[in-house]
Amino acid sequence: MGQKVHPYSLRVKINKDWKSKWYFDKKLYSTILHEDFLIRLEIMKFLKGIKFDISDIEIIRNNPQKVTVVIVTPRPGSVIGLKGSNLEKIGQLLTKKISKKISIKIKEVKRPELDAQIIANGIAKQVENRVSYRKVLKSALSTSMLKGAQGLKIKIAGRLGGAEIARSFEVKEGRVPLHTLRANIDYGFSEAHTTYGIIGVKVWLFKGEVLGRQTNSDAGQVINKKPFRERGETVKNFDKILNNREKINEKQTRALNKKDGLSKDEASLLNKLSSSFSKERVDSNEQNIGG
């Protein structure tokens, strides 16, 4: 059911970040959240003429009495206005609404063809201007794919072309892996207000995988400690271990092998050396007694 879930909700802190960045006591949570909603609503109302060029509005709160608003747009000049007049008016409007100090910043979108929200806004604007929705969708699809998108899916729903029965129409090109969490999926939604009613536009844009596919050569295998020789042990220490194992049983030997971090091959070699060493010592003792 990945297609039913907002792509951002699954990918926060994987390859997406929160659009509102703040932390407050749970008693104030609903109040602050409502303030965020009002801020976004008032900005969109004020910039109604250029609302189709706004990609996102980020809100940052470092202290309770100051709010930093970041407006993300491909046309900073239109938002700023003549000598910053628009920003000043927005600041005054928001201060009056929420009675807090407002700081407004502008962030430019350098590649609007690869921004899902701007694509959705552009489609909605053209549909409102009575351009054929099929033509609009195909044009948006080809433009984004040429600019480097790895996959794009656009869905439009409502009374398309003035039809009496509402329906949906969808176009897709490339890969859009909604179930892959490492996939960087950008999502945008917009509404076209026509004489027939509201037509919804949804856009899913696949920009590539943010976290590379990681494969381990030892996947599914038991990982042993480093071999005895790789741990910098000397031959003297090896001989010392050999001498200590002359008079112990099999169970104790296995326990010591595990403690010393020996691999199966090393333990087998050590057992053989231990048995041959013991045999040589017995033979030499017998010769001494006989002599």
From Swiss-Prot:
One of its GO terms (cellular component) is cytosolic small ribosomal subunit. Disulfide bonds: none annotated. GO terms for biological process: translation. Residues 39-110 form the KH type-2 domain. Pfam families: KH_2, Ribosomal_S3_C. InterPro entries: KH_dom, KH_dom-like_a/b, KH_dom_type_2, KH_sf_prok-type, Ribosomal_S3_C_sf, Ribosomal_uS3_bac-typ, Ribosomal_uS3_C, Ribosomal_uS3_CS. Signal peptide: none annotated. SMART domains: KH (SM00322). GO terms for molecular function: mRNA binding; rRNA binding; structural constituent of ribosome. It comes from the Bacteria. Keywords: Ribonucleoprotein, Ribosomal protein, RNA-binding, rRNA-binding. Part of the 30S ribosomal subunit. Forms a tight complex with proteins S10 and S14. Binds the lower part of the 30S subunit head. Binds mRNA in the 70S ribosome, positioning it for translation. Belongs to the universal ribosomal protein uS3 family. This is Small ribosomal subunit protein uS3. It comes from Borreliella afzelii (strain PKo) (Borrelia afzelii). The gene is rpsC.
